[in-house]
Regions:
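Juxtamembrane intracellular "pre-TM" segments in multi-pass secondary transporters
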Residues: 175-201
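Helix-breaking motifs and short loop linkers at transmembrane-helix boundaries and internal kinks
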Residues: 26, 58, 79-84, 228, ...
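Paired small-residue
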Residues: 73, 84-92, 285-293
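C-terminal membrane-cytosol helix-exit motif in multi-pass small-molecule transporters
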Residues: 159-180
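Extracytoplasmic gate region of multi-pass secondary transporters
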Residues: 14-15, 198-239
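Helix-to-loop junctions at the C-terminal end of transmembrane segments
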Residues: 46-58, 248-260
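C-terminal transmembrane helical hairpin of 12-TM major facilitator-type secondary transporters
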Residues: 262-299
């Protein structure tokens, strides 16, 4: 659920609210896109900082800090009446997402039996999918009732849930860890360079990041502005994508263990252009099916 706060609430939920907040705040697509990009840039900077911080602080401390930042960012977004404060909130949420996500797989894996630890990342991905389902369903319903101004109420709801989860996380979650080894450099590049094929991996992950920035950031806007979908229809497509993420994460984790990570990644990257092309047509039923496949690929 912490993954849902850091990613679904603090990052990916922006895409489903994009048309509403753009029209309600009276800003251009360029400005709205800049806000979304600032969120992603903050996440990127956060990953570099976390690689250094985790060599000095315990993982649980880093994850708590991320949850605090994500919650605070959602609070700023919920009270924002102008773009600058909204951008500030999303930048904080982006940083928080990095502080949350990087330690989370280790903490989750340590809580599972040894033969189930490979499912940790998949379960975290399922949490993100669950968060996307919630955000898209809530935003679709509130936008139908309140109109474009509903985006603020959606962020208020997300902030309330994040605050409750922060309290529960602080009270309940525990993680045993020896004192961190100090001396790691900023960004963790020394450790990264020890991995075989680290350059292709970086390129592949960068392409993946670029794809989700474009797809999740403009998914709803593309369907509503260019394909003429109504709010409920675009929200349904976003919801189906989130549902697929819930089941796709553990599914692809198991598949990669059986057939290898390289083959699984190659299959996913090969399917990307096919699925995106179908969505770009805007034809209702095929686009809904493609949204489901897209959710699996994001997993």
């Amino acid at each position: 659920l912490a993954g849902a706060v850091g990613h679904s609430f603090g990052r990916f939920g922006y895409g489903v609210l994009y048309p509403a907040l753009r029209d309600d705040l009276g800003i251009t697509n360029t400005f709205a896109g800049f806000i979304g990009s600032a969120n992603v840039a903050a996440y990127l900077v956060g990953t570099l900082i976390v690689a250094w911080v985790t060599s000095r602080l315990r993982l649980l401390t880093v994850m708590k800090a991320g949850l605090v930042m994500a919650t605070l960012g959602l609070f700023f977004a919920s009270i924002a009446s102008e773009p600058v404060l909204l951008a500030t909130g999303l930048i904080l949420a982006g940083l928080g997402g990095a502080f949350l996500w990087i330690p989370a797989p280790v903490i989750a894996a340590d809580a599972l039996p040894e033969d189930k630890r490979h499912l940790a990342v998949g379960l975290l991905g399922s949490g993100i999918g669950l968060g996307i389902v919630f955000v898209s369903t809530l935003s679709g319903w509130l936008r139908d009732v309140e109109g474009d101004s509903a985006w603020s109420a959606v962020y208020s709801t997300k902030f309330s849930i994040a605050l409750i989860l922060l309290l529960l996380f602080t009270l309940v979650v525990r993680h045993r860890q020896e004192s961190p080894k100090t001396g790691g450099r900023f960004g963790g590049f020394d450790s990264l360079k020890k991995m075989t094929g680290w350059k292709p991996l970086i390129i592949a992950y960068s392409i993946f990041g670029f794809m989700y920035l474009l797809v999740l950031g403009y998914f709803t806007t593309r369907l509503e502005d260019d394909s003429g979908w109504v709010t409920s229809e675009s929200a349904l497509a976003f919801t189906l994508m989130g549902i697929a993420m819930i089941f796709g994460a553990p599914f692809f984790t198991s598949i990669s263990k059986r057939f290898g990570v390289r083959n699984t990644l190659a299959l996913c990257f090969a399917m990307w252009p096919v699925v995106i092309t179908i969505i770009l047509t805007g034809v209702y039923v095929p686009a809904l099916v493609a949204s489901i496949l897209l959710g699996f690929l994001f997993s």
